[in-house]
Structure formats: C-alpha cells, structure tokens
C-alpha cells in the first residue's frame, strides 16, 4: 500500500456528505534528535 492510498482511505472515512473534511490528522515523529539534549 502506498502512502497516498493511506491518506485516501482516511479522507473517505472522515469526509462529510458533501465531501469536505472536518477532521485534521497530525502525525508526530517525536522530538528532533538534533535539538534534544542527550540523556546523561
């Protein structure tokens, strides 16, 4: 399955009757390792 196929299925599940989306999904990969101090 491609990434765009994933988004298409999410859109169809959360679309209103007229096709507009009312739910916004965000994806967080966690903190940026370059900006996060190392554990000591």
From Swiss-Prot:
A GO molecular-function descriptor: hydrolase activity, acting on carbon-nitrogen (but not peptide) bonds
Superkingdom of source: Bacteria
Enzyme Commission number(s) from the entry: 3.5.1.-
GO cellular component assignments: cytoplasm
Entry keyword annotation includes Ion transport: no
UniProt keywords, alphabetically: Cytoplasm, Hydrolase, Nodulation
Keyword hit for Signal: no
Stretches assigned to the NodB homology domain: 21-40
Uppermost EC category: hydrolase
One of the GO BP terms on file: carbohydrate metabolic process
Subcellular location: Cytoplasm
InterPro entries: NODB_dom (IPR002509)
Active site: residue positions: 28 (proton acceptor)
Reported function: Is involved in generating a small heat-stable compound (Nod), an acylated oligomer of N-acetylglucosamine, that stimulates mitosis in various plant protoplasts.
Family of this protein: Belongs to the polysaccharide deacetylase family.
Protein name: Chitooligosaccharide deacetylase
């Amino acid at each position: 399955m491609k990434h765009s196929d994933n988004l298409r299925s999410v859109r169809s599940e959360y679309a209103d009757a007229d096709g507009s989306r009312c739910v916004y999904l965000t994806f967080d990969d966690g903190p940026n390792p370059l900006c996060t101090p190392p554990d000591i």
